[in-house]
Swiss-Prot record:
Gene Ontology BP terms: ribosomal large subunit assembly; translation
Name listed for the protein in its UniProt record: Large ribosomal subunit protein bL20c
Keyword Ribosomal protein: yes
Function noted in UniProt: Binds directly to 23S ribosomal RNA and is necessary for the in vitro assembly process of the 50S ribosomal subunit. It is not involved in the protein synthesizing functions of that subunit.
PROSITE patterns: RIBOSOMAL_L20
A molecular function GO annotation: structural constituent of ribosome
A Pfam family it matches: Ribosomal_L20
Gene: rpl20
GO CC, alphabetical: chloroplast; ribonucleoprotein complex; ribosome
UniProt subcellular location: Plastid, Chloroplast
Length: 117
């Protein structure tokens, strides 16, 4: 069987990969084999970290809400606050509550005081 060099098709594939890795440092942006390895690794990391990002933001929102609620009332905590929210059927998600906690604490205090009653 004769050898096929692939010609312009291989060149087109390599340039496409090189464009992806153009911002990488050193050999990771120059050598085809290391570029392909780094591309696989970069895409795997991006996929993994998209899931982590959702987790981290949720943790941040919970920490912010908890800090503001505890500063208002020492006996009251985040878990009780969320439990009472669900009992009263107030559907506010954690992202919105965290923004209210940062931008307008008094509003969150009013919400928590209404729920406690």
């Amino acid at each position: 069987m004769t050898r096929i060099k692939r010609g312009y098709i291989a060149r087109r594939r390599r340039t496409k990969i090189r464009l992806f890795a153009s911002s990488f440092r050193g050999a990771h942006s120059r050598l085809t084999r290391t570029i392909t390895q780094q591309k696989i690794r970069a895409l795997a990391s991006a996929y993994r970290d998209r899931g982590r990002q959702k987790r981290n933001f949720r943790q941040l929102w919970i920490a912010r809400i908890n800090a503001v609620i505890r500063s208002n009332n020492v006996d009251y905590s985040y878990s009780r606050f969320i439990h009472n929210l669900y009992k009263r059927q107030l559907l506010l998600n954690r992202k919105i509550l965290a923004q209210i906690a940062i931008l307008n604490r008094n509003c969150l205090y009013m919400i928590s005081n209404e729920i406690i009653k």
